[in-house]
Amino acid sequence: MVTASESWPQLLEQLLVGNVLSKENAAALMEAWLAEELTPVQTGAFLAAFRARDVQGSELAAMAEVLRKACALPDAKPNLGLVDTCGTGGDGADTFNISTAVAFTAAACGAHVAKHGNRSASGKVGSADVLEGLGLHLKAPLESVLGALPASGVTFLFAPAWHPALVNLAPLRRSLGVRTVFNLLGPLVNPLTPEAQVLGVAKAELLDPMAEALQQLGLTRAVVVHGAGGLDEASLEGPNEVRILENGNVRSDQLSASDFGLTLAPLEALRGGDLVTNQQILEAVLKGEAPDAHRDAVALNTALVLWAAGVQSDLSEGVKQALTSLEEGQPWHRLVSLRDALEGRKEE
């Protein structure tokens, strides 16, 4: 294990030649980052080295464990069988906020959703951006964040509010101008440590390491999905590659919208826009007033969440339940309920 500053060059050399860090060294590196023991040059070099080779699930899990322990949330967490819908972003597809719509739809179908999110990563508008635009208080007190779950079935955790230790790294990450290992860690460090998760990845080569990381972090059920057309959600365009974690084992599969009676559609049909446009799309989807492609994309991804959360054992039934909920506008009531619980803007 790395114990002294003079050992960091040797650790960097391991990464540069393609070696996998031990769990102990990966954890020590994260602890050093959080303690600001590394210079900006050293940190930049490590981030670039991780970018230059495929990161491993064991490395991600070890670093995520450190971040989870460092978060600002007390150990007391609700025992509700939580599920998260946070993904890596980075697909550059500029779709509307699908996973955000899924969070409220899944809640309306009976799941307890702890949505962990941030501002924009892949699109022009991140989950935090669009929810703030619709009146949610992103930095609500802990009692409000937790208190929303029993009544609303959903809560939102704004990542920077619960991971203050990462604030000092933010300027350097931005200055690098490229995505780093921290973009992969974000979906793994939900402060409420949900038992289940649906995690979208923008690149197929991330399916296995992210599934391995979730497995090592002890999740009960999870789905890691890489959508047709390069989407970090299940797509309507064609076959979607998935890794399914269940009973401690990971298996590979494919699923398509057409498997569930949904109409195939190109990515263009799911395009979003600026903040106002994405707010309008999200509101329309949740109220049951959206185009079929928007509705179907949300229903397909919601079915994965309902399976992971144990609400539905059959994906086809999950799609049907989600479609019914969307058509009745039930998810919008969940957003309004959460907005009120987080002491945001009241419905006029």
Swiss-Prot record:
GO terms for molecular function: anthranilate phosphoribosyltransferase activity; magnesium ion binding. Binds 2 magnesium ions per monomer. One of its GO terms (biological process) is L-tryptophan biosynthetic process. Mg(2+) 2 binds at residues 232-233. Mg(2+) 1 binds at residues 99, 233. Pfam families: Glycos_trans_3N (PF02885), Glycos_transf_3 (PF00591). Keywords: Amino-acid biosynthesis, Aromatic amino acid biosynthesis, Glycosyltransferase, Magnesium, Metal-binding, Transferase, Tryptophan biosynthesis. Its cofactor is Mg(2+). Anthranilate 2 binds at residue 173. Pathway: Amino-acid biosynthesis; L-tryptophan biosynthesis; L-tryptophan from chorismate: step 2/5. 5-phospho-alpha-D-ribose 1-diphosphate binds at residues 87, 90-91, 95, 97-100, 115-123, 127. Its EC number is 2.4.2.18. Anthranilate 1 binds at residues 87, 118. GO terms for cellular component: cytosol. Catalyzes the transfer of the phosphoribosyl group of 5-phosphorylribose-1-pyrophosphate (PRPP) to anthranilate to yield N-(5'-phosphoribosyl)-anthranilate (PRA). This is Anthranilate phosphoribosyltransferase. The gene is trpD.
